[in-house]
Regions:
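Active-site rim helix/loop that mediates acceptor-substrate recognition in acyltransferases
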Residues: 1-4
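Acyl-donor (CoA/ACP) binding surface of acyl/acetyltransferases
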Residues: 6, 10-130
Length: 130
């Protein structure tokens, strides 16, 4: 059985929660997690996810000793797939008919970031989210 950890996204200028970033299926044997995020619709397409995602990934790879973070995104969700690309994730493959939604099966894009790649990613300015 795995563990789940979540962080609430709270813009500094409003102090109001607008989403969550988290990991589930934490495999302590091989230091691997599956990431997820949900933001309020009015914050999608803004830099809020990039900032929060970088903070969480920095914590996972830096303080928690995670080796690999995976993300499985519906192939139809262009915005989420683009956000992971901007974070520096590598598209590793396509999981065919891997997610059920609306009574149908849909493909998912498999993304990953490994600790050695993340160490090459520049730090983010974090004062806008806490």
């Amino acid at each position: 059985a795995g563990t789940t950890a979540c962080w609430v996204i709270v813009p500094a200028e409003t102090g109001v929660p607008v989403g969550i970033v988290g990991v589930r299926s934490m495999d302590h044997t091989c230091s691997m997690v599956e990431g997820f995020a949900v933001t309020a619709e009015e914050f999608r397409g803004t830099s809020i996810f990039q900032t929060a995602g970088r903070l969480v990934l920095g914590c996972l790879f830096g303080q928690m000793g995670v080796h690999r973070a995976e993300f499985r995104i519906d192939v139809r969700n262009g915005r989420a797939n683009g956000a992971l690309r901007k974070l520096g994730a590598t598209q590793e493959g396509l999981l065919r008919r891997a997610r059920a939604a609306d009574g149908e099966f849909h493909d998912q894009v498999l993304w990953a970031i490994v600790a050695t790649d993340w160490n090459d990613t520049p730090a983010v300015h974090t004062s806008s989210v806490h």
